[in-house]
Amino acid sequence: MSSLTHFDAQGQAHMVDVAAKPATHRVAVATGRIEMQPATLALIESGTAKKGDVLGIARIAGIQAAKKTSDLIPLCHPLALTRVALAFALAEKGNAPQVVCTATVETVGPTGVEMEALTAVQVALLTIYDMCKAVDRGMRITDVHVLEKHGGKSGSYLADPQG
């Protein structure tokens, strides 16, 4: 396992110097889900939530969040993102109606975009919670993780499909 890179020799936090790293195409895909009551999922699916188009607004919130990641996570580098895409799947897994969010983020740069993909997913799911909390305060955000990343010196990572 590699050592932690966000600490200097004295143990002080610092932003990693990426100036000497080559710019390469970087891609990260993250996912997560929000579980809810069947009636809440039906509201989202029908587009009749009081606050409007839940998934449309969650998509925009996720895109904005990816772009603002370095403002939220102190040691993240500001990046020129070349693509941010969010997809939603409505499903009933067992007895848990849910919305699954998947974010794909890309850049050409010296550092990866995993944090941007994770931030996009989290904020999109939080937006769904915010827009539906009046009818379902028991929603649960869960299973947020990186599915895959490509590019850079460390190469590719694919999450174990078994979890």
UniProtKB/Swiss-Prot annotation:
Superkingdom, taxonomy of origin? Bacteria
Instruction: Supply the SUPFAM superfamilies for this chain.
Output: Molybdenum cofactor biosynthesis protein C, MoaC
Q: Which reaction does it catalyse?
A: (8S)-3',8-cyclo-7,8-dihydroguanosine 5'-triphosphate = cyclic pyranopterin phosphate + diphosphate
**What is the disulfide pattern of this chain?**
none
- Lineage of the native species? Bacteria, Pseudomonadati, Pseudomonadota, Betaproteobacteria, Burkholderiales
Sites where the protein binds substrate: 75-77, 115-116
Query: What is the protein named?
Result: Cyclic pyranopterin monophosphate synthase
Q: Name one GO molecular function term.
A: cyclic pyranopterin monophosphate synthase activity
